Amino acid sequence: MMRGTKYIWQHEGWPHMQWDDTSFSNILAEINLLRGKLLGRVSMFGFEEQNLSMLESMTQEIVHSAKIEGEELNRDSVRSSVARQLGLEYEGLKNSDHYTEGVVQVMIDAVQHHDMPLDAERLFSWHAALFPTGRSGIHKILVGDWRQGEEPMQVVSGPLGHEKIHYEAPASKDVLGMMSDFLYWFDTENTLDPLVKTAVMHLWFVTIHPFDDGNGRICRTLTELLLSRADQTSQRYYSLSSEILNHRKDYYQYLEQAQKGGLDVTPWIRWFLQTLKLALEAAFEKTEGVLRKSRFWDAHRSVSINERQRKVLNMLFDGFEGKLNSSKWYKINHCSQDTANRDIRDLIAKGILKPTGEGGRSTNYELVSL
């Protein structure tokens, strides 16, 4: 343990954290208004549009939660896996690998079964799904169990030999007892505002740091579980991890400040709620894209569009990565280059696509605005 540094879990009274409710009462009111607006907007969607919005939100949550830790997941692979595991239709490009399937299973279990009790075995199964090889990178780790050993669990940054220690977690021998208290509180605490409870839970879990690795990802999965309980639905239409990623430096800064401070965690809760508000605002704006897709197909219901064209057009609305060109077209549809060019020219003639770029092989195409 670093001399002179007293972490939150070392204070008498831990884990009974404190906060000033008046400090974020206005933010809570704004969040609840936004939640109502978002669910009201989504309720205007048809069944297909609701599924599309949920698919996009869950894909973002999974991809961006991993990216917070510096891990890059293939977006199309994640989206295909989410769609398949939820039984949704999606015209994707890629089959998912075993690892991606496991990562997606963890998130789906959390949100689809948010009302089920949380126990150690459930967390262990999630951990095993995140580390199917028993390794984190090239390092062998203990999978599916609380961390063990005498070595201190530290959060560090910087080059080897010049590391900066941001945080040191409780000793491994204390994890079992601390997690028992945490799990009991997780399922029995019902007096707190559910969003405040989610913020407190987030800090509490990462402070214990119960696993050898993957603590951040599992913590954000637990956050989604509690948000699903708060919303009283397994339908996810916003992504908190996307906003955390946008403010990653602040995320780690506020966590570190809370972990190195006393039991008053008001600043952390306020930051968490402000970030949740941003996530809801971003999600509400994105519902415009879903409505845009619906308006597009309504406006073109009498236009002759073949299956190849329909497939690519839907992908353009559903979060197509990069720019569309004829090469991507024939790869997506497994057709010839000539067929791809004919399909594209046909959509240009019908006023649906327009060319951009320099022309020739570098020509890209985008949707014409309605």
Regions found by a protein language model. Name each.
Residues 1-370:
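FIC/Doc superfamily catalytic core
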